[in-house]
Amino acid sequence: MLIFDEVITGLRLSDGGASKYFGVTPDMTTLGKIVGGGMPLACYGGKLEIMQCVAPLGSVYQAGTLSGNPCAVAAGIETIRQIESIPNFYEELDRKSAMIENAIREKGLNVNRCGSLMTVFFNDERVKSYDEARACNTESYGRYYRHMLQSGIYTACLLYTSPSPRD
């Protein structure tokens, strides 16, 4: 069974998440608060034969404290509407992400990017594995991270389409 955890990538790489972006169809997918516009909402889905195992059709019971929270569901619906209302949303998101990536590279930093998801590494080459990430200069990254925070720039954020080139 192939399960895609799209808590980070869902609706950020494409309207079909990493699954659509990479052209791979999983048996199940999980999505996090992006589907609720940042509100406490999550969901999962899968192939018919798997989903039929979930109650009330099947014997697998599932429930949650915030299941079906009306405010979160409304925020999720509005998130989808906003994405659908912007022509070429994902192309624009990718263009703006590339602009930020290039600005980071111009400063001599190494950045890995997939769509709008990106991170800076303090090393000489593109990071392709966990071991390579661990070998990076974490002390330099710490100084960079603290400097960015003190400058009002939150590097753990995810890009959206609103920023202009001036931003």
PLM regions and their residue ranges:
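Structural motif of enzymes handling amino- and sulfur-group chemistry
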Residues: 66-86
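Structural signature of PLP-dependent enzymes
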Residues: 79-102, 130-138
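Conserved PLP phosphate-binding loop immediately N-terminal to the Schiff-base lysine helix
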Residues: 1-22, 28, 34
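Short beta-alpha connecting loops at secondary-structure transitions
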Residues: 27-30, 56-65, 85, 130-133
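Active-site PLP attachment segment
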Residues: 24-53, 68-75
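Conserved small/polar residues in nucleotide/adenosyl-binding loops
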Residues: 160-167
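Conserved PLP-binding catalytic core of the aspartate aminotransferase-like
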Residues: 98, 109-143
